[in-house]
Regions:
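Hydrophobic membrane-insertion alpha-helices, especially the h-region
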Residues: 13-30
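C-terminal catalytic-base region of ester-bond hydrolases, centering on the histidine
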Residues: 178-214
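Alpha/beta-hydrolase active-site loop
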Residues: 84, 105-131
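Short beta-strand element of the alpha/beta-hydrolase
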Residues: 69-77
Length: 214
């Protein structure tokens, strides 16, 4: 009985320790993801205008003023509120493209890499799909394009680089000259555009980002 009691106490202490460790990890994770970049007023104004814009769950759809069969799916950067990219997407919308912004779980595209599949299924009238993303969103968009090359017509990377084997010939890569960490990872030359004086955070309206050069 004594031996059984000893093992019982040890097992209880072990289980308690594991539970506490899990609780600490969960608390740390939720603290990490709750500290994200918020969209600035200029971005929220686009949403508030209601001009050719509609929110459907985790999707924000910006539609051109006339019918189109071409759309861009956009994955936001890590820990950035999706609405921060609305000014950029609104400009694309005005060129005649449907733009579909995906708000990611916990503001991290890594948790829903294949979100584009669900988007495509919801819009059967769209015949030509492009997938785009900023920073981590670009990396995850690149992964999706690499795994589903027959489903997308092209890939657009902002402050990001190709991840996977999607062809550079079908990819547009745009980065700022002050974003050296991205430039160092670009080992291809096709369709690469450098914005002089540009920084990592300037693709969205969410303020300065830690690590950006002045």
């Amino acid at each position: 009985m004594q031996i059984t009691a000893v093992f019982h106490r040890k097992g209880l202490r072990l289980a308690t320790g594991v539970l506490l460790a899990m609780l600490l990890l969960a608390a740390g994770f939720f603290w990490y993801v709750s500290d994200y970049y918020r969209a600035e007023d200029a971005a929220l104004d686009v949403l508030a205008s209601g001009e050719n814009i509609e929110v459907q769950g985790s999707l924000t759809i910006l539609s051109p003023s006339y019918p189109t069969d071409t759309a861009i799916i956009f994955y936001p950067g890590a820990k950035v509120e999706g609405a921060a990219y609305l000014p950029l997407l609104d400009q694309l919308r005005r060129t005649g493209l449907t733009c579909i912004l995906v708000e990611m779980p916990f503001y991290l595209a890594i948790f829903d890499v294949n979100a584009a599949e669900d988007v495509m299924a919801q819009f059967p009238d769209i015949q030509h799909w492009y997938i785009a993303g900023h920073s981590m969103g670009g990396v995850m968009a690149s992964q999706f394009a690499s795994e589903h090359p027959d489903e997308v017509d092209g890939l657009i990377l902002l402050g990001a680089y190709l991840y996977g084997d999607y062809p550079p010939a079908d990819t547009l890569t745009v980065y700022g000259s002050l974003n050296q960490s991205v430039e160092d990872e670009i080992d291809y030359t096709e369709n690469v555009v450098e914005i002089q004086g540009g920084n990592h955070a300037q693709f969205g309206n969410y303020g300065p980002q830690k690590g950006d050069l002045p």
